[in-house]
Every structure is written in C-alpha cells, then in structure tokens.
C-alpha cells in the first residue's frame, strides 16, 4: 500500500477503522441510558394517602423513605424460643405507589409449619407472587417459616385484601399490641459507637438498619430501602449487658463470602443464605445470623461484616 496518502484519505481510513469499535460500544451505552430513562419511580406519599389500605387491614402503618407505607403484624400470640431466648416475631407488608399509577406490595409472613401451606394457597389465590420460603432461626420452638411475597396492581386496596386473606390463614392477632418501651441494660451507646450508627428502641429491642448504596430496581421499578432492601440487626437484651443478636445482611454476590467469613471470625453463627426476591437488580442475597454474647463484643464483630458491604446507616 502506498504510504503517501493525502490527509483526506487518511481521515477516511481512520474513520473506517474506528467505526466498528464505536458500533460495538454505542448500543450498550445507549441501552444503559434507555434503562435509566425507563425506570419507574416511587411517588411521595403521606399516611392519609393510605387510608383505604389501613381500613382493609384494620390497622395503621407508617410512611418510611417518604414513599413506603409499611404495616407490621406482630405475632404476640406466638412466643418463639431459641437457645433459651424468647422472641416475638412478626410479618410485614410494604406498599409503594409509582408514577405509572400502580402500587407495589412486598413483604413477608412469619408462620408456623401448620400455617405455611394455607398461607401459600391464600397468597396464590390473591394474585400475590411467592418469592422465597425459608427459616430465619436455628433450632427453635414452635417451628417457624417465612414466606416472602410481592405483587402490583392499580388498586392498593385490592393488594391489601390479598394480604389480609393470607394473614387470615394464620392466627396472627387482628389488632396490634400495646406500645411499650421496656428498659434495657444493654450498653447501647457503646454498641452504637462500634457500629457507627444510631439504633432505635423497638419494644426493648435495639435495632439497626443499613441501606444499600446502589439503586435497586425490579422490572424497572425503583425499590426504596423500606421495601426490604436493607441489612437489619437486632439486639435482644438477655441480662448482664449480654445480648442475643439476629437479623440479616443484604449483599450482592461479590460480597457474600467476605461477609460470611467475617461473621464466623467474630463467633457469630450463620443461619441461612438465600434470596428474598426473584428479579431485583442488582441481585441481592441475604445472610441470617445468630449469637449470644456481650453486646459490645457482638457489635464489633458485626461491624467487620458490615465493612464488607456497600451499605450506609439508615436515616
């Protein structure tokens, strides 16, 4: 080939050589931009906006993240004992309204083994999709299972009726327990220092929530943290400043092994590793844990596991 090409000829050849590279990258970039544009966003709501849902469920919830109406269903009828510690568990449903006029509900039901299949049948009949079935605890009595679900519709009250029907398959009390804030002997200030986060006293249980830093989506719908995309840590006081800790870490696939290793190095038992949803992006996995020890020592071990995740304290 003659190397003595005129400038215009050189420009044509350069453009021809670069074009395949650009052609290979532009669609991916365009697809990512299109996906961002197609995200369906939650809309801000207040508790008054959810009055029909509250009427159906027979109780009020609270608005979290400015958009998620979260309703809790305590199983105060069902004290659960594990390793000598009595826990009072519960279910929840989180409703989120979107700018396309649809409402999404996500949540989980805490059910006994005899209640499990009737609850699953009720979810199916009500048009709610089952996304996970598993345990959250090691050996415990009575045997408990957790069923995660989600669904969406234009009418939030219809979703609430489906949730209520599933709850009716259990002996979950129809009214919430009376509010209480029993005193605790945990050194909560030192625990918060170790975790570098503020906790909340929830009926004597000191709880911490950590949000994922990424934007989590499901079929294009942006999922606020309060829909369940969080790490939750609960400290149950057992006396002498000792605590039973349980909860779950929300992790991407690349974080799982480091989190599990950190938990075990800290003497914390790994209970379960599983999903809660089916189609969220990025894909999340949840590791449930359990331990009993001095509360501050446990907090230090949990901090090491938190450091392996891309999370930040809620609030």
Language model feature labels by segment:
Residues 1-7, 18-21:
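N-terminal secretory signal peptides
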Residues 41-44, 75-76, 108-115, 181-182, ...:
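Short, surface-exposed ligand-recognition loops at beta-strand->loop->(often short) alpha-helix junctions
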Residues 96-106, 236-246, 308-315:
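Structural motif
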Residues 60, 111-133, 139-181, 185, ...:
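Hydrophobic, ordered structural segments
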Residues 51-86, 100-107:
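An N-terminus-focused feature that recognizes amino-terminal "leader" regions
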Residues 79-96, 214-237:
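Intrinsic, low-complexity N-terminal interaction/targeting segments
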Residues 6-7, 26-52:
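C-terminal segment of N-terminal export signals and the immediately downstream linker at the start
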Residues 87, 113-138, 253-276:
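Extended intrinsically disordered, low-complexity coil regions enriched in Ser, Thr, Gly, Ala
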């Amino acid at each position: 080939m003659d190397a003595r090409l005129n400038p215009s000829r050189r420009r044509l050849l350069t453009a021809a050589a670069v074009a395949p590279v650009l052609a290979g990258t532009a669609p991916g970039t365009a697809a990512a931009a299109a996906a961002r544009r197609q995200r369906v966003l939650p809309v801000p709501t207040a508790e008054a906006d959810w009055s029909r849902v509250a009427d159906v469920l027979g109780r009020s919830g609270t608005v979290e993240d400015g958009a998620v109406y979260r309703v809790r269903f305590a199983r105060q009828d069902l004290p659960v004992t594990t390793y000598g510690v009595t826990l009072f568990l519960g279910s929840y449903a989180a409703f989120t309204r979107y700018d396309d006029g649809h409402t999404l509900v996500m949540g989980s039901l805490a059910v006994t083994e005899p209640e499990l299949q009737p609850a699953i049948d009720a979810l199916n009949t009500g048009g709610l999709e089952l996304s996970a079935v598993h345990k959250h605890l090691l050996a415990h009595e009575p045997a408990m299972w957790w069923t995660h679900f989600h669904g969406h519709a234009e009418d939030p009250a219809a979703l609430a009726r489906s949730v209520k029907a599933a709850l009716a398959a259990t002996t979950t009390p129809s009214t919430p327990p009376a509010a209480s804030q029993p005193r605790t002997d945990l050194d909560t200030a030192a625990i918060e220092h170790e975790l570098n986060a503020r906790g909340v006293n929830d009926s004597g249980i000191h709880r911490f929530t950590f949000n994922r830093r990424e934007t989590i989506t499901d079929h294009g719908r942006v999922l606020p943290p309060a829909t369940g995309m969080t790490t939750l840590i609960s400290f149950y006081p057992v006396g002498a400043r000792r605590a039973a800790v349980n909860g779950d870490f929300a992790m991407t696939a690349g974080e799982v092994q480091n989190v599990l290793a950190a938990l075990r190095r800290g003497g914390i038992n790994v209970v379960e590793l599983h999903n809660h949803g089916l189609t969220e992006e990025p894909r999340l996995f949840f590791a449930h844990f359990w331990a009993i020890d001095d509360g501050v020592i446990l907090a230090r071990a949990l901090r090491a596991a938190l450091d392996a995740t891309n999370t930040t304290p809620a609030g």
